[in-house]
């Protein structure tokens, strides 16, 4: 709701006062020579390594009883996370194992005993996370220098790498600038393998120092790389990584090339390189690791501490140290050029540039000009620069990040400096400094159209397979955030008109050409949600806002406008309830957290500055964001502590994702100045946006762009749980989710807030029929499956109708209460279908809806030689590699088509007016079609077979979170806590049909009594057992549904039927499993669990037709008891725990599935485009004559006004399934099908003639081409109904605006006429050009 004029005036006044306070603080911390710089915070790694270095070199005088050591101790202990005793990568993040070990060692070197409570707490954290053997490479490397790791456990790093020519695939210049400058000195250190004394004067791996951090201190020879077999064949299979590891092992066998004649030459080249790259001030690359490593390498090569190079290097290292009230700590780098350029640009945005309204106050103008001159003087115009090695441009002109870094100018810094210069003085657009800076930026563009930070085309990602690369930071590829900054800079220069000054035409043309390549790169990088990933700032917020600031100058292009709109809507959706924006650094490892986190001034300012380029200042969301900045500004007395006018405690800068995060306090300051200044400028402008796009923002646009996603679920409770987990992820992105499934699941679906659609049938039907014959293949052959056909036909028809039909139950509730009315009343037409493979009609429904399809499988369904189709197994064993395995997939699909194909074709032809399909499509084309398939099981259990296509992802398992909602009965707790010396076993057979539950309970209780165990039996069958339960033995407990995630961690064994959900729960809990398979995929999972050593051999004595005859015999009872004894023997516990750890470390499969769904949906919407009349809305229709796309609102309005008829419009095709089938390669089977099809045509014609002659009316199947009937197409009718709804809803949303009566329709009609005229003008122009070309050829 818009603010009243007096409220807006009050907000403007508050924003102006906040801006003034921030400007005053800016000048209060300006340095004497005009520049700005604030300390750059990081984790404890750099301070800890500084302590190690000074301890290793006694001449550096680190006296543990002195003031310096006390200050270092004080800071390290103060940086510890008190809650868990760890040291993390940034405030608010969980502890990091490697950082904690480094801090622990540093404190021990500083004299803190291991008995210190802080170190005791740290020790517990380290051991809980696997111990010291699991630290990253560089931590292991530093530990080796003190003998705490044997050098033989450190990967080889041959110094000969420096000798590789620049054209070689592997040489120092294919590494990123930071990796190159860090690695070269480390090559020297690795050659020397130094061993420095510890406080107890020991440097022997067996000395016992730090043994308290090892799980097994007797074995420190722990390989860094995973086992070779895993890289060759296991879940970590990677040929490149395997080759590097084999090379490393081969080098180790021959002594790492140390004794070769080339080693001395290599070391000399390393030292020459270091000497060449040292700055006059002693710095190397302006970054702690190369500065620290270079001094270290020189000392090992015989340079004395008094040598000028070493002295200057040590002085540069000390300049990174900060002494404040928290103690002494080390910065990773310093950022004066970056800080100053951004600060000046912000101040100029606030009117302090030349001629600005604020510049005349006091001496502000002079102080800003001094800062500009200071930055300008840092332009790098000399011959240095590693960027020259591969850049096609050899002309210098960039700026670096730090005071002294002539070798590594920064693309990002250079663009900001150029914008700063032009913002301060419009005449600078024609200056040499700006032109040379732009020339240098153009020369640094990568072949993919984007920009990295320091190098060109530095994108050899395979380098991350090198054994010592565990931080994924060896290269500097193109990133969206840097590329967006370049476009912002280009856009400013291309639209610059102040004072009649502009860029040279030749340079402008080059900027345009470069920008087109950059835009193409950004289109490829945009995520399905509309956001962009941020490499150098946290994270999707930073990446997205950087790009958005670069797009306005190019939004004349429709593709740019669409990309911008998607990003704007995503950013608006991420706003927190308090009005601000924030994002946790955890989003780098968990993309589902993108845009989520506590509000910060930096994130809020980034969002506001970007959105104010697309939305008016009157937008309520933006005003709420400005109010957050105003309300959260710190008092003036607190500014110096924060180095900002807003809280700066949370880090928002990124060094290396998931490895190093940086705290730039000025980020929370100067970006907020720019945002407030832009808001105030926009409120001064006349509101020129009172046109349709902005009237339809927020409520209307958000509602009408909310996508309909249909989930088709056929199966048991375990199957529906998986889909509800996925539905929860989709609902968070504000999609409308409809779950079509059996009525047995209605209560569960609606309890989770999703719309339910009843398709009939139920899992009990399957269990009763298939329990008689476990092998589905034989069930089909024997005809047993015919009992299900009639029910399945009804169910499949309803699945199809669920994609467009009105809700057949009125109890559906939406998770978003604000959209509840719209979700219930807006006609549903699926924009995307998500289905289990078993629903059969999924691809046909997707074809009729012209919508993308994503399949979700809980068991393997694509052909492979690794195992047979799981539905054809009747024993828990199989032979890998058999041709029969591969054939079973096609054979089963053929039988399925023989059973259901005629019904499917009948629906296709008669109901949906589509062509029928041949059996070859079902048995070959569908199985080999590249339809996205997400496999929800762990790759540790079933790795991805090599035969499967690229669109198949083994995503990991998923669970439906229920623990927080579950309150266990008191009787259950008492049962579990009683007789603790007895092991407890859980027995659950899921949705299996049990004909005689009392007999089953009796058999289970008897077996448990024989092995002296307690047993919890989870029932799901419908049977009144109250009389039987009263006489249960004391060691038996029968319960209804209990969440596996709550119960399984509390027991010692798990007996179940082998369902995919039960198996995944057992794997996650790490509990040994005994599987008694009934039918279908249960035999497959039973075989897998046993083969992996996670439980005893499966029991094959269980039920047929739901009976328990197998275990009621004496032999059956004995076998059941023996298997249960084996289950509880403890021999499977270790393997189960290891598997649990691996499974838990995997990404939640539901997150992967949601990402795939978002990607497919985004791609489909991008193909359909946006409305030619209302660009804010996606297209649903296409005008046949002009080819113009229309949204539902525009189409319904034009039809209602009589300008168009519905027959003039075709539904937009988001995915062309017909064309997709035609692209599939043909086989001999297609030739057979063609002949059969031809004969069918002939036979059909004979039947038609006979029917006409005899005037017979029958169900004669048409096999020819079907012409669509617009008036009877149910999906088209549903789309028309939705379009009329959208029109009425949009008009209601505009009721309070100036467009009343027929003005809305009149505006749409005017836009339509203009769009049609423009379309025909373009067509005539193309026709004229073609005729002109033909005339010239004549």
Curated annotation (Swiss-Prot):
> Where is region (Glycosyltransferase) located?
688-1338
Tell me the superkingdom of the source.
Eukaryota
Q: Does the keyword Zinc-finger apply?
A: no
Q: Which GO terms describe its cellular component?
A: lipid droplet
In which ranges do the PFTB repeats occur? Answer: 19-61, 69-111, 267-307, 434-475, 515-556, 564-615
State the EC number(s): 5.4.99.-, 2.4.1.-
Pathway recorded for this protein: Secondary metabolite biosynthesis; terpenoid biosynthesis
Q: Name one GO molecular function term.
A: sterol 3-beta-glucosyltransferase activity
- Cystine links in this protein are none
Which reactions are catalysed by this chain?
A: (S)-2,3-epoxysqualene = isomotiol; isomotiol + UDP-alpha-D-glucose = 3-O-(beta-D-glucopyranosyl)-isomotiol + UDP + H(+); 2alpha-hydroxyisomotiol + UDP-alpha-D-glucose = 3-O-(beta-D-glucopyranosyl)-2alpha-hydroxyisomotiol + UDP + H(+)
Q: Which residues does the entry assign to the active site, renumbered to this chain?
A: 412 (proton donor)
- Site feature Transition state stabilizer: at which residues? 338, 401, 536
Biotechnology applications of this protein? Fuscoatroside and some of its derivatives show interesting antifungal activity against Candida albicans and Aspergillus niger.
Tell me which positions the record assigns to the signal sequence.
none
Alphabetic keyword roster: Isomerase, Repeat, Transferase
The similarity comment for this entry is: In the N-terminal section; belongs to the terpene cyclase/mutase family. In the C-terminal section; belongs to the glycosyltransferase 28 family.
State the protein's name: Terpene cyclase-glycosyl transferase fusion protein fsoA
Annotated source species: Humicola fuscoatra
């Amino acid at each position: 709701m818009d603010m009243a004029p007096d409220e807006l005036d009050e907000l403007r006044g508050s924003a102006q006062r906040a801006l003034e306070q921030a400007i005053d603080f800016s000048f209060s911390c300006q340095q004497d020579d005009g520049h700005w710089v604030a300390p750059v915070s990081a984790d404890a790694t750099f301070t800890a390594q500084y302590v190690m270095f000074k301890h290793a070199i006694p001449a550096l005088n680190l006296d543990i009883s002195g003031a310096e050591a006390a200050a270092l101790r004080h800071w390290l202990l103060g940086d510890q996370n008190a809650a868990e005793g760890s040291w993390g990568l940034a405030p608010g993040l969980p502890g990091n194992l490697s950082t904690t070990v480094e801090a622990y060692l540093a404190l021990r070197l500083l004299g803190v005993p291991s008995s210190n409570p802080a170190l005791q707490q740290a020790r517990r954290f380290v051991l809980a996370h696997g111990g010291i053997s699991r630290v990253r490479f560089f931590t292991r490397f530093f530990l080796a220098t003190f003998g705490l790791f044997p050098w033989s456990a450190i990967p080889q790093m041959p110094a000969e790498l420096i000798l590789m020519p620049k054209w070689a695939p592997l040489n120092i210049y294919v590494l990123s600038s930071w990796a190159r400058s860090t690695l070269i000195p480390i090559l020297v250190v690795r050659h020397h393998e130094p061993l420095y004394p510890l406080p107890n004067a020991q440097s022997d791996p067996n000395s016992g120092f730090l043994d308290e951090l090892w799980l097994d201190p007797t074995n420190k020879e722990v390989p860094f790389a995973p086992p070779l077999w895993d890289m060759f064949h296991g879940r970590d299979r990677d040929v490149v990584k395997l080759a590097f590891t084999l090379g490393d092992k081969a080098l180790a066998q021959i002594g790492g090339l140390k004794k070769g004649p080339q080693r001395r030459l290599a070391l000399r080249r390393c030292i020459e390189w270091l000497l060449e790259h040292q700055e006059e001030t002693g710095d190397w690359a302006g970054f702690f690791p190369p500065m620290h490593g270079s001094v270290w390498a020189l000392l090992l090569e015989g340079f004395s501490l008094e040598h000028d190079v070493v002295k200057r290097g040590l002085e540069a290292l000390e300049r990174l140290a900060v002494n404040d009230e928290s103690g002494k700590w080390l910065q990773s780098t310093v950022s004066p050029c970056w800080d100053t350029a951004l600060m000046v640009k912000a101040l100029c945005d606030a009117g302090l540039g030349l001629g600005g309204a604020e510049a005349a106050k006091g001496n502000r103008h002079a102080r800003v000009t001094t800062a500009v001159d200071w930055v300008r003087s840092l332009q790098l115009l000399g011959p240095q620069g590693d960027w020259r090695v591969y850049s096609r441009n050899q002309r210098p002109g960039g700026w670096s990040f730090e005071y002294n870094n002539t070798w590594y100018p920064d693309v990002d810094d250079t663009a900001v400096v150029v914008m700063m210069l032009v913002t301060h003085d419009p005449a600078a657009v024609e200056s040499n400094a700006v032109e040379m800076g732009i020339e240098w930026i153009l020369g640094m563009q990568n072949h993919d159209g984007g920009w990295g930070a320091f190098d060109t085309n530095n994108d050899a990602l395979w380098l991350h397979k090198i054994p010592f690369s565990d931080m994924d930071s060896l290269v500097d590829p193109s990133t969206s955030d840097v590329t967006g900054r370049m476009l912002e800079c280009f856009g400013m220069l291309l639209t610059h008109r102040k004072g009649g000054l502009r860029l040279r035409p030749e340079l402008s043309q080059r900027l345009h050409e470069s920008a087109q390549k950059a835009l193409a790169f950004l289109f490829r990088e945009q995520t399905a949600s509309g956001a962009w990933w941020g490499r150098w700032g946290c994270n999707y917020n930073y990446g997205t806002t950087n790009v958005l600031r670069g797009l306005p100058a190019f939004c004349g292009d429709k593709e740019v406008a669409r990309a911008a709109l998607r990003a704007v809507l995503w950013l608006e959706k991420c706003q927190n309830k308090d009005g601000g924006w924030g994002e946790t650094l955890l989003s780098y490892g968990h993309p589902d957290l993108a845009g989520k986190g506590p509000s910060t001034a930096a994130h809020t300012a980034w969002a506001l500055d970007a959105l104010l380029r697309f939305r008016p200042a009157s937008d309520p969301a933006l005003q709420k964001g400005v109010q957050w900045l105003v309300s959260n500004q710190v008092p003036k007395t607190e500014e110096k502590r924060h180095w900002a006018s807003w809280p700066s405690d949370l880090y928002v800068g990124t060094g290396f994702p998931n490895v190093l995060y940086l705290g730039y306090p000025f980020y929370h300051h100067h970006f907020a100045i720019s945002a407030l200044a832009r808001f105030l400028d926009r409120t001064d402008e006349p509101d020129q946006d009172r046109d349709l796009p902005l009237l339809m923002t927020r409520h209307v646009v958000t509602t009408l762009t909310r996508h309909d996603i249909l989930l088709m679920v056929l199966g048991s409770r375990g199957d529906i749980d998986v889909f509800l987990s996925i539905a929860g992820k989709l609902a968070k992105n504000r999609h409308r989710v409809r779950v079509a499934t059996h009525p047995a699941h209605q209560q569960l679906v609606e309890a989770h807030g999703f719309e339910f659609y009843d398709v009939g049938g139920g899992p009990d039907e399957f269990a009763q029929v298939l329990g008689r014959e476990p092998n589905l293949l034989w069930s089909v052959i024997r005809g047993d499956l015919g009992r299900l056909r009639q029910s399945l036909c009804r169910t499949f028809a309803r699945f199809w109708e669920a994609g467009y039909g009105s809700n057949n139950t009125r109890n559906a509730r939406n998770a978003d209460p604000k959209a509840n009315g719209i979700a219930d009343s807006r006609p549903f037409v699926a924009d995307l279908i998500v289905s289990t493979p078993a629903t059969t009609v999924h691809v046909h429904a997707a074809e009729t809806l012209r919508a993308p399809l994503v399949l979700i499988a809980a068991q393997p369904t694509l052909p492979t030689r690794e195992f047979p189709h799981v539905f054809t197994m009747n024993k828990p064993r199989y032979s890998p590699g058999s041709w029969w395995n591969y054939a079973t997939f096609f054979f089963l699909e053929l039988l399925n088509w023989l059973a259901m194909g005629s019904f499917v074709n009948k629906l296709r032809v008669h109901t949906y007016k589509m062509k029928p399909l041949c059996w070859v499509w079902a048995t070959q084309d569908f199985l080999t079609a590249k339809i996205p398939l997400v496999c929800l099981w762990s790759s540790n259990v079933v790795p991805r077979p090599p035969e499967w296509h690229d669109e198949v992802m083994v995503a990991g398992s998923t669970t439906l979170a229920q623990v927080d909602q579950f309150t266990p009965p008191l009787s259950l707790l008492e049962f579990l806590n009683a007789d603790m010396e007895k092991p407890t076993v859980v027995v659950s057979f899921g949705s299996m049909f049990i004909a005689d539950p009392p007999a089953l309970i009796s058999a289970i209780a008897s077996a448990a009594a024989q092995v002296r165990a307690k047993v919890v039996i989870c029932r799901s069958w419908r049977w009144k057992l109250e009389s039987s339960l009263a006489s249960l033995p004391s060691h038996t407990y029968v319960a209804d549904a209990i969440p596996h995630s709550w119960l399984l961690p509390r027991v010692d064994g798990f007996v179940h039927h082998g369902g995919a959900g039960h198996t995944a729960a057992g794997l996650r809990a790490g509990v040994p499993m005994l599987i008694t398979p009934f039918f279908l995929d249960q035999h497959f999972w039973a075989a897998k669990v046993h083969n992996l050593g996670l439980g005893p051999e499966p029991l094959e004595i269980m039920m047929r037709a739901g009976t328990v005859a197998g275990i009621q015999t004496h032999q059956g009872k004995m076998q059941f008891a023996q298997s249960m004894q084996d289950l509880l023997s403890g021999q499977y516990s270790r393997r189960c725990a290891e598997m649990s750890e691996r499974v838990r470390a995997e990404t939640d499969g539901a997150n992967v599935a949601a990402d795939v769904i978002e990607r497919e949906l985004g791609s489909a919407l991008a193909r359909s485009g946006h409305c030619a009349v209302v660009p804010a809305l996606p297209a649903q229709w296409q005008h046949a004559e002009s080819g113009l796309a229309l949204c539902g609102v525009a189409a319904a309005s034009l039809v209602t006004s009589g300008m168009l008829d519905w027959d003039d419009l075709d539904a937009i095709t988001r995915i062309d399934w017909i064309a997709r089938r035609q692209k599939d390669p043909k086989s001999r089977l297609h030739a057979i099908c063609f002949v059969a099809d031809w004969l069918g045509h002939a036979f059909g014609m004979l039947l038609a003639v006979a029917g006409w002659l005899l005037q017979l009316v029958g169900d004669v199947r048409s096999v020819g081409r079907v012409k669509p009937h617009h008036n009877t197409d149910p999906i088209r009718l549903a789309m028309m109904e939705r379009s009329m709804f959208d029109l009425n809803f949009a008009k209601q949303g505009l009721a309070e605006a100036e467009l009343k009566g027929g003005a809305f329709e009149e505006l749409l009609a005017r836009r339509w006429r203009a769009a049609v005229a423009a379309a025909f003008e373009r067509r005539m122009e193309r026709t004229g050009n073609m005729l002109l070309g033909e005339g010239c050829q004549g």
